[in-house]
């Protein structure tokens, strides 16, 4: 007896979903133009010759602000469905959301006290 009997259609879907991108990329590689030259591999800067290095070092503070932004952006993504279905979920879900928010607020206070949000 096959245990996963009800999942036959899902297996077919999974195989097709994996094959479509592979076939599309293979077909595009077969029909693409095969010419190129040194101009093709140069960096394009608004139609003029590139000046200087292509790599630029960014200040680490940009990364800290980006990291804090991503954390609180993900928080918003998690809190929106909770806020929409708050009336049906009850008091336990409210406590879970408070725990989630308090963990994030503790992290924000920690980053603030460590000076991660200072721009000096």
From Swiss-Prot:
<keyword id="KW-0793">Thylakoid</keyword>
<keyword id="KW-0521">NADP</keyword>
<comment type="function">
    <text>NDH shuttles electrons from NAD(P)H:plastoquinone, via FMN and iron-sulfur (Fe-S) centers, to quinones in the photosynthetic chain and possibly in a chloroplast respiratory chain. The immediate electron acceptor for the enzyme in this species is believed to be plastoquinone. Couples the redox reaction to proton translocation, and thus conserves the redox energy in a proton gradient.</text>
</comment>
<keyword id="KW-0618">Plastoquinone</keyword>
<keyword id="KW-1133">Transmembrane helix</keyword>
<keyword id="KW-0472">Membrane</keyword>
<dbReference type="GO" id="GO:0019684">
    <property type="term" value="P:photosynthesis, light reaction"/>
</dbReference>
<keyword id="KW-1278">Translocase</keyword>
<dbReference type="GO" id="GO:0030964">
    <property type="term" value="C:NADH dehydrogenase complex"/>
</dbReference>
<dbReference type="Pfam" id="PF00507">
    <property type="entry name" value="Oxidored_q4"/>
</dbReference>
<keyword id="KW-0874">Quinone</keyword>
<dbReference type="GO" id="GO:0009535">
    <property type="term" value="C:chloroplast thylakoid membrane"/>
</dbReference>
<keyword id="KW-0934">Plastid</keyword>
<dbReference type="GO" id="GO:0048038">
    <property type="term" value="F:quinone binding"/>
</dbReference>
<keyword id="KW-0520">NAD</keyword>
<dbReference type="InterPro" id="IPR023043">
    <property type="entry name" value="NAD(P)H_OxRDtase_bac/plastid"/>
</dbReference>
<dbReference type="InterPro" id="IPR000440">
    <property type="entry name" value="NADH_UbQ/plastoQ_OxRdtase_su3"/>
</dbReference>
<dbReference type="InterPro" id="IPR038430">
    <property type="entry name" value="NDAH_ubi_oxred_su3_sf"/>
</dbReference>
<dbReference type="GO" id="GO:0008137">
    <property type="term" value="F:NADH dehydrogenase (ubiquinone) activity"/>
</dbReference>
<protein>
    <recommendedName>
        <fullName>NAD(P)H-quinone oxidoreductase subunit 3, chloroplastic</fullName>
        <ecNumber>7.1.1.-</ecNumber>
    </recommendedName>
</protein>
<comment type="similarity">
    <text>Belongs to the complex I subunit 3 family.</text>
</comment>
<feature type="transmembrane region" description="Helical">
    <location>
        <begin position="89"/>
        <end position="109"/>
    </location>
</feature>
<keyword id="KW-0813">Transport</keyword>
<comment type="subunit">
    <text>NDH is composed of at least 16 different subunits, 5 of which are encoded in the nucleus.</text>
</comment>
<keyword id="KW-0150">Chloroplast</keyword>
<feature type="transmembrane region" description="Helical">
    <location>
        <begin position="10"/>
        <end position="30"/>
    </location>
</feature>
<feature type="transmembrane region" description="Helical">
    <location>
        <begin position="64"/>
        <end position="84"/>
    </location>
</feature>
<keyword id="KW-0812">Transmembrane</keyword>
